[in-house]
């Protein structure tokens, strides 16, 4: 039995979530808690980002993207951004 990963949201990700429709907020939170937190290896569900976002991981949920840092030593998934796929990669 693997240990569960903790999911935390930084201030920017919380602000991003608040801008979204309540239904998609619920879906994102459920996805992170039920799928990613319980995964033995959360990398299996995501994709590593490159270039200016190197070191971050991306999860897809419908047309939305969840950008995270994985801190393996702490078993922590830190969500740093959430948004629609058309805008999430803009800086």
Model-assigned labels for residue ranges:
Residues 1-11, 15-19, 23-26, 30, ...:
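Enriched for short, Lys/Arg-rich terminal
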Residues 34-58:
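A short, surface-exposed loop/turn module that caps and links secondary-structure elements
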